[in-house]
Amino acid sequence: MKTIYLKCFLAVFAAAALFAGCSKNAETDSNPDPTPPAPPTPAYKVGDLYTKGFVKGIVVSVDETGEHGLLVSLNQCEEVWSYKVEEAMGSLPGSGAYNTSCVQKLHDWKEYYPAFVEATKDNVGALKNWFLPSMNELAKLYSAYTGHETNDTEGGTGSLNSIRSPKTGPETASASSEEQQRKDFFNKCLTDNGGDAMEDKVYWSSSENGPSIVFAFDMGTGKSIDTPSDLDKRARHMVRAMASF
């Protein structure tokens, strides 16, 4: 009798173990595969092509991670800053995005501010990615274009001057050659992607300096313009949009 009870107990125990194992397998099999990890955010460097959504341009500067920075548009044109004598920013300009937003709040800006119309023409719908750069942002574009830094860029306004180490004799020619190589490299990044090459000309900033004058930057000399007639809002200078990413 004891043998029969023992056999029955073992049979019941084996059945219970088998059922538990099947339930566990079924539970395990019902779980979906784990979600694959998201791809890492790409790290950019100066000269890279950035393209995401409706934004496409060449990287001008990046932060320490390489994930965020500034880029410049592929195209440029020559245009008047404004046909109106007024202070769109109250002579307190900030970043290019802020300055551009101040102009866009004016009900007639599309009629009287052609430089801003050109700078924002690639914005789609309510998106406001592109803007006319401030002096500080133009300084970063100049650095990407020539390899030289500028001073006095705090706050995005003021007089800018290229910082070049003083060189004489053969060193001068070498420095000039290095700068030209840098320009060729950056322009190739633009033209290889269907864009317009940068030029050693005066470029408008969005940094207003009064009712009738605006800061502008000479990409050839690396200096801000100080001739009043060249700073008149009705003068024609190069316009090149920038965007943050």
Predicted feature residues:
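An exposed tryptophan-centered "aromatic clamp" motif
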Residues: F116-N129, M135-D218
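Bacterial Sec-dependent N-terminal signal peptides
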Residues: A16-G47, E179-Q181, Y203, F245
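Carbohydrate-recognition loop of C-type lectin domains
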Residues: T221-D232
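Extracellular adhesion/carbohydrate-recognition regions
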Residues: P34-W130, K201-Y203, I213, D232-M242
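Secondary-structure transition/turn motif
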Residues: L74-C77, M219-K223
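Sec-dependent bacterial lipoprotein signal peptides
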Residues: M1-G21
